[in-house]
């Protein structure tokens, strides 16, 4: 029973190896450090296992003073204190809380008007470090607003001119933009060029073609000849008053032997095989050979000069 009345031995509050970097070196009771550097204070109620939160502080000494004040209220004059010699300093700091109040509220409190003092003036500012910082910042802003300073004059800065546009190129067309050049059409992509070409081709195919008009790009400067006129020019067929040429190139005459001799059958159609056989016979009689394309191959230039006036020109070479 005698040991029951004794005071408990001094024990360090925060757990070793946890909390902030200075938590293990702290010797204050009920004070521990967070991992991000803040100091907090807690105290256990008498005969209970619950703990009371005292607040967060910037330094370990402020947290220790908060614990000492709570211990005096809960345990009386026999409570364990972290900083017993700083009790007078903490009491003096309590009188300095009025400096955070407005001037009108402080004057009313000095005259005895307790009702004019706002409720936030009774807060424990020492236990709330963030409130200290807020009040200091508000005071600095108030002082700066009362004496405004002129901002330094801005020097005009010349903006750099934009770089000249780079030449744009595409797989189908290349357009170079230069200063002072005439307005050029926008570049055309490959797909647009292909669509325009297909549209032009479709328009040409859909347009009605004239039999007498020459096809553009193919034989435009060569006149269209009839088969009879062609044979007469090369000397194979002589002009005959009795014969006539129809629209489809068929030879009609009184004498059918002349038509059969030059490859025209009874139906009026030209027989190319018969013409090739006749040309082979002519070539064999004159000592020439028929080439691969139906042309004559002469042995020397004298034969070319001799038969040049009457030799037929192969129509496959035209």
From Swiss-Prot:
Location (main, coarse): nucleus
Location of region: Disordered: 1-24, 140-178
Protein's cellular compartments: Nucleus
BP GO annotations: positive regulation of DNA-templated transcription; response to stress
Keywords: Activator, DNA-binding, Nucleus, Stress response, Transcription, Transcription regulation
DNA-binding recorded as keyword: yes
Stretches with biased composition (Basic residues): 1-15
Any Pfam family: AP2
Record bears the keyword DNA-binding: yes
Gene Ontology MF terms in the entry: DNA-binding transcription factor activity; transcription cis-regulatory region binding
Role played: Probable transcriptional activator that binds to the DNA sequence 5'-[AG]CCGAC-3' of the cis-acting dehydration-responsive element (DRE).
Family that this chain belongs to: Belongs to the AP2/ERF transcription factor family. ERF subfamily.
The protein's name in its UniProt record: Dehydration-responsive element-binding protein 2E
Organism in which the protein naturally occurs: Oryza sativa subsp. japonica
Upper classification of the organism: Eukaryota, Viridiplantae, Streptophyta, Embryophyta, Tracheophyta
């Amino acid at each position: 029973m005698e040991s029951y009345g004794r005071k408990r031995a001094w024990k360090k509050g925060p757990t070793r190896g946890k909390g902030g970097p200075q938590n293990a070196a702290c010797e204050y009771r009920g004070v521990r450090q967070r991992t991000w550097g803040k100091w907090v204070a807690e105290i256990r109620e008498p005969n209970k296992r619950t703990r009371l939160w005292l607040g967060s502080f910037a330094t370990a000494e402020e947290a220790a003073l908060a614990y000492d004040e709570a211990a005096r209220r809960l345990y009386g004059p026999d409570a364990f204190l972290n900083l017993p010699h700083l009790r007078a300093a903490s009491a003096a700091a309590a009188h300095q809380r009025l400096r955070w109040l407005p001037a009108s509220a402080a004057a009313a409190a000095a005259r005895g008007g307790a009702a004019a003092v706002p409720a936030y003036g009774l807060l424990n500012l020492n236990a709330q470090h963030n409130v200290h910082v807020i009040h200091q910042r508000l005071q600095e802003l108030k002082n700066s607003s009362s004496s405004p300073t002129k901002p330094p004059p801005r020097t005009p800065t010349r903006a750099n001119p934009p770089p000249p546009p780079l030449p744009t190129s595409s797989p189908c067309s290349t357009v170079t933009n230069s200063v002072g050049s005439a307005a050029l059409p926008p570049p055309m992509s490959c797909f647009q060029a292909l669509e325009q070409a297909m549209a032009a081709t479709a328009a040409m195919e859909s347009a009605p073609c004239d039999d007498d008009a020459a096809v553009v790009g193919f034989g435009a400067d060569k006149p269209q000849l009839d088969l009879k006129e062609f044979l007469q020019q090369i000397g194979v067929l002589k002009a005959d008053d009795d014969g006539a040429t129809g629209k489809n190139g068929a030879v009609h005459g009184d004498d059918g032997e002349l038509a059969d001799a030059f490859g025209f059958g009874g139906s009026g159609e030209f027989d190319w095989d018969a013409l090739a056989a006749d040309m082979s016979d002519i070539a064999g009689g004159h000592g020439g050979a028929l080439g691969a394309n139906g042309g004559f191959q002469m042995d020397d230039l004298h034969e070319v000069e001799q038969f040049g006036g009457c030799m037929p020109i192969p129509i496959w070479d035209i």
